[in-house]
């Protein structure tokens, strides 16, 4: 009888040790600094606008090689090269002296900070500072090699449609 009690007690002790050793430790959550990310994304938008306004679209280091961009009245543009070619075409009809500016209004990073949705607006002003176009955009970024790069974006004008 004593032997059975001893074996039962030993079994309880072994099971207790096994369950205690198998408890999962809580992994601390990655802290994502939204303000720092928003500042980083706004700096990318500012660099994009500066290159666009200077007519140097090849200097725009914003899109991934396999990015897809969606715009009003166009088929989706697939790939960085197609997006840059479209920008070059747009610049041919971009008003002389006009400037585009982008504003990051919201960011929504993933819990680990490796993916990010940006919601923003844009405004085009002529040489006198008068607004000639404006709209909104949404962009999806992925972090590659420590830097965000746009993999998808979509934009639309909020100006009234002109009749053809």
Describe each region flagged by the PLM.
Residues 1-32:
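Bacterial Sec-dependent N-terminal signal peptides
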Residues 21-62, 162-164:
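Short, low-complexity N-terminal intrinsically disordered segments enriched in polar/charged residues
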Residues 25-26, 134-161:
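Short beta-strand edge/turn micro-motifs at domain boundaries
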Residues 48, 59-60, 67, 79, ...:
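Hydrophobic pocket/interface hotspot
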Residues 63, 110-112, 144:
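Structural motif
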Residues 67-78, 91-97:
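A short gly/proline-enriched turn/hairpin at secondary-structure junctions
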Residues 88-127:
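Surface-exposed, charged secondary-structure patches
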Residues 129-131:
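Solvent-exposed, non-transmembrane alpha-helical starts
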């Amino acid at each position: 009888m004593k032997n059975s009690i001893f074996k039962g007690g030993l079994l309880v002790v072994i099971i207790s040790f096994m369950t205690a050793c198998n408890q999962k430790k809580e992994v601390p959550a990655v802290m994502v600094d939204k303000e720092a990310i928003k500042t980083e994304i706004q700096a990318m938008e500012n660099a994009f606008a500066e290159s666009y306004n200077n007519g140097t679209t090849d200097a725009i280091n914003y899109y991934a090689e396999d990015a897809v961009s969606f715009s009003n009245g166009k088929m989706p543009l697939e790939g960085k090269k197609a997006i840059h070619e479209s920008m070059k075409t747009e610049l041919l009809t971009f008003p002389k002296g006009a400037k585009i500016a982008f504003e990051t209004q919201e960011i929504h990073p993933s819990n680990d900070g490796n993916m990010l949705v940006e919601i923003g607006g844009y405004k085009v002003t002529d040489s006198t500072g008068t607004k000639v176009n404006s709209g909104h955009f949404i962009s999806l970024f992925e972090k590659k090699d420590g830097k965000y790069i746009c993999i998808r974006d979509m934009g639309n004008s909020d100006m009234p449609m002109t009749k053809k």
